[in-house]
């Protein structure tokens, strides 16, 4: 009986491991550090930011009051999922995710359009922005 149970557990573990291995990952072209700004003349309050999309599906983002990024406002972290031109950010402590469509302009430039956001977010307007990869 013990042997059958052990064998069943091994088969189950192998099956689940195989499913995890086939799980689609995040778009690898977004992994890394990026910076962006919200237009000063746009629909929402001006912000600039630096974010880091990690391969393990976590992110952190620091918001700044100024374009030079010397006056931090706050840092947030959470999990991200991106595939097929859709990026979803689930910030820790925020009930609903922010969702964007994205288009890669080149390896170091990505354009986003906001399509869904948590009602507690600082801007409830639809807006778009471009981020640039931070190298070095």
Model features per residue range: what roles?
Residues 19-75, 86-136:
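Lipid interaction determinants
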Residues 8-15:
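Bacterial N-terminal signal peptides
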Residues 1-6:
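Bacterial N-terminal signal peptides that target proteins for export
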Residues 78-82:
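Predominantly extracellular/secreted and cell-surface proteins with exposed
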């Amino acid at each position: 009986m013990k042997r059958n149970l052990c064998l069943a557990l091994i088969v189950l573990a192998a099956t689940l491991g195989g499913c995890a291995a086939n799980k689609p990952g995040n778009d690898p072209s977004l992994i890394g550090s990026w910076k962006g700004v919200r237009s000063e003349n746009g629909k929402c309050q001006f912000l600039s930011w630096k974010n880091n999309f990690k391969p393990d599906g976590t992110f952190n983002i620091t918001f700044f009051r100024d374009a030079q990024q010397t006056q931090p406002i706050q840092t947030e972290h959470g999990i991200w999922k991106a595939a097929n031109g859709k990026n979803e950010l689930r910030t820790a402590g925020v009930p609903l995710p922010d969702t964007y469509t994205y288009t890669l302009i080149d390896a170091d430039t990505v354009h986003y359009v906001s399509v869904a956001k948590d009602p507690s977010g600082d801007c409830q307007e639809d807006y778009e922005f471009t981020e640039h990869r931070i190298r070095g």
